[in-house]
Amino acid sequence: MPFTLGQRWISDTESELGLGTVVAIDVRMITLLFPATGENRLYARNDSPITRVMFNPSDTITHHEGWQLKVEEVTQENGLITYIGTRLDTEETGVAMREVLLDSKLTFSKPQDRLFAGQIDRMDRFALRFRARKYQSEQFRLPWSGLRGIRASLIPHQLHIAYEVGQRHAPRVLLADEVGLGKTIEAGMIIHQQLLAGRAERVLIVVPESLQHQWLVEMLRRFNLRFSLFDDSRYSEALLDSSNPFDTEQMVICSLDFVRRNKQRLEQLADASWDLLVVDEAHHLAWSEEAPSREYQVIEQLAEHIPGVLLLTATPEQLGQQSHFARLRLLDPDRFHDYEEFVNEQQKYRPIADAVTLLLGGERLTDDKLNLLGELIDEQDIEPLLKAANSQSEDSEAARQELVTMLMDRHGTSRVLFRNTRNGVKGFPHRVLHQIKLPLPTQYQTAIKVSGIMGAKKTLDARAKDMLYPEQIYQEFEGENATWWNFDPRVEWLLNYLVANRGEKVLVICAQAATALQLEQVLREREAIRAAVFHEGLSLIERDRAAAYFASEEDGAQVLLCSEIGSEGRNFQFACQLVMFDLPFNPDLLEQRIGRLDRIGQNREIQIMVPYLEDTAQAILVRWYHEGLDAFEHTCPTGRTIYDSSYQELISYLATPSEQEGLDEFIHTCRQQHEGLKLQLEQGRDRLLEMHSNGGEHGQELAQSIAEQDNDINLVSFALNLFDIVGINQEDRSDNLIVLTPSDHMLVPDFPGLPPDGCTVTFDREQALSREDAQFVSWEHPIIRNGLDLILSGDTGSCAVSLLKNKALPVGTLLAELVYVVEAQAPKHLQLTRFLPPTPVRMLMDRNGTNLAAQVEFESFNRQLNAVNRHTSSKLVNAVQQEVHTMLQQAEALVEAQAQALIETAKREADDKLSTELARLEALKAVNPNIRDDEIEALEHNRKMVLENLNQAGWRLDAIRLVVVTHQ
């Protein structure tokens, strides 16, 4: 093409320079000025890597002064182009714009514009873009979005609760599973779903101070959710940036004490427009009608301002009716306003629970029972269902299940309360206690005597705690460097035990970090035992490394030495040997220690080793836990109640272990109390609520469906392809592990989700669970989600040129592979992607206007193609530009029919699903007052907005690839 001064060209290799202008021409060279950057470039006149910029009718172009022109006519004179059209700001027609006046910062966003401007991508990027579109569309349609990306075992009851609650608008529920059943994971899954679906954007978690780090770790490790921990110092820092410090972060964890202490903070929190509030240990919020506690009032004030509320609490039976009512009152004060009324109402639900037990028992129903069921369900046309349930036919079981579902819907608090018990959930291991009584060394005897004399002024509480840890008493008198481990028989026993069990992973827990560190040194120096240490002084990354070292089968540590606080929130169910080097002060901490191994998914019996020193507080506490509470070999739901009521008597025995008069009787009384409370709990079990909470077959199906998705080979190949193209370094390790690190040539300088020092990932859920340092990669992992966004929100792969070597076709045959996207723009919370995700429609057009896509599958076609360098691609495009325009016009006519069909299907599906959901809730409102008006209103509004937005759905060209046939 002849060059003329003033022509506009773009660089094929440096498109970031913008639009260039020809400013000098000589015999062999031309000079382009790029006004956007002020740079000049010298190019050879022949075969230079630049492309002439020419726009077509219907394009919109920008003048260097900023106004835009809709092109209607293109004229050319002396090698220079003039565009004629309508000015968009003034609507003036017949306006002429010479090409020299085009805006130099011009960027090409439409695929065809980029193609004609020579901004042509590599072929593999086009393929990645199409796959990204295809897989993203498929993932949006799956019903369990937000559930499968978690780094946790697929446990049916947890998945069921999370699915049920996570799908709701502003859920307000009580999660009251027994200890060890995973309330934190359920809450995390609900948060994850709400965030992914756009139902929530700002989340506040309020927990006791001791659990802050546990929640921080759980949210990050299991759900890849980065919360900010707000304490006094963080609050002061944020105050410098904003009048309301809580507006500076989207997801915040803080302690209840942090909020309670300062009225201004509470008001700022309440004003910070949160979408979801999560409160752990909610059973500690004391309430009475006359005098609610300050803590209760704090949460009440927050719950009034925040639409969604999750309360995590002990089981209702443990709390008592009044305390249980107080939690429900936080969720819905209009519904639960009168305690007496609540008690009467609860009694009315007893027959419903009995009816469910009857139906599930499979026994024949008497006429009285049939009448009772008819009255309870109170539906027209219920007779055939009752008849089928009482028959011997094949339909009997299905009819009974349907009746149970109807009863569940009418159950008083089943929509706001979820509670599973260990009796209702199978899969827990047995626990076996081994008590190892050891002699009390004379050094400790002396230290304890002296401590008794010198510590006489200490409180009973402080003396009791001292007596449990004699090594600390000894160090108080002998100095911090006193070598207590040289004579403490527990150390000798531990060494021998570990040597005898070299093949076993052993978790050792002690109260203090210092004890753990000293034990590690002894194990290493005396028996060369490999041990990892885990305590509160370590950073999150250091704890991950220690846990990974312990988890590794090949060259890992045999022992993990944990302090009390350091072990919070970590689970090691691949080990089954637990050594308690000392004992914690209360039953909750004891259960927490055992809970590190006693989880669903533990496949072996848990061996609990308790070496203790005779004639000490340790010996008394072992007896009280085992004989009084049965807390070692079984979970102890009564522990906190009995601990609180017998606290004074217990600490007086612990503070003076030599005075044991009445101890046997005290332990016997505690055991009787324990058995009595346990019986009450068992009798008070609400089997209907348990059925509703564990989800039955629905939970099983969810777990199975997600497990099948876990082995998705498409994810692995797509992810590796994505890492290659983004420029992320990959290093294979053993055991299905890959180490990802940033490179110097990535598509973006900082890839979101990839730490600067890299991370270890695996596509295997079990592997991720056994390796603390390995992240579990699924379609929901931030690296994959951010990778999809990076590719699809930008121009990567939006145009390409390839060669097809095929002697069956004439040389020069031209094909245009077009990828259109059918989509609707709408606020994220409407979740339009359930019905119409951005859906790719692929077309393969020939010169005759025929679409060959149905006959030529993408992957097999892609494998036959060869890449072309950018410069050659530009020349090819210029040669066939007019033909491509014709093909695009032909494709537009064809894609409209396909797009409209997709949109109509989405509208029908949305209307059916949302109308059914709405009708069900409205019908249930008549028989179950726990269905909130605002929930129905939100669903009604949601349905209206979804259908409106689907009506406005459209389609656009997302990517184009020209394919030219060659025989070489």
Curated annotation (Swiss-Prot):
Residues 164-334 form the Helicase ATP-binding domain. It is an enzyme of class 3 (hydrolase). A motif (DEAH box) lies at residues 280-283. Its EC number is 3.6.4.-. GO terms for molecular function: ATP binding; DNA binding; helicase activity; hydrolase activity, acting on acid anhydrides. The keyword Ligase does not apply. Disulfide bonds: none annotated. InterPro entries: Helicase_ATP-bd (IPR014001), Helicase_C-like (IPR001650), Helicase_RapA (IPR023949), P-loop_NTPase (IPR027417), RapA_C (IPR022737), SNF2-like_sf (IPR038718), SNF2/RAD54-like_C (IPR049730), SNF2_N (IPR000330). ATP binds at D177, E178, V179, G180, L181, G182, K183, T184. One of its GO terms (biological process) is regulation of DNA-templated transcription. Pfam families: Helicase_C, RapA_C, SNF2-rel_dom, Tudor_1_RapA, Tudor_RapA. Keywords: Activator, ATP-binding, DNA-binding, Helicase, Hydrolase, Nucleotide-binding, Transcription, Transcription regulation. PROSITE patterns: HELICASE_ATP_BIND_1, HELICASE_CTER. Residues 490-644 form the Helicase C-terminal domain. Transcription regulator that activates transcription by stimulating RNA polymerase (RNAP) recycling in case of stress conditions such as supercoiled DNA or high salt concentrations. Probably acts by releasing the RNAP, when it is trapped or immobilized on tightly supercoiled DNA. Does not activate transcription on linear DNA. Probably not involved in DNA repair. Interacts with the RNAP. Has a higher affinity for the core RNAP than for the holoenzyme. Its ATPase activity is stimulated by binding to RNAP. Belongs to the SNF2/RAD54 helicase family. RapA subfamily. HAMAP family: Helicase_RapA. This is RNA polymerase-associated protein RapA. It comes from Yersinia pseudotuberculosis serotype O:1b (strain IP 31758).
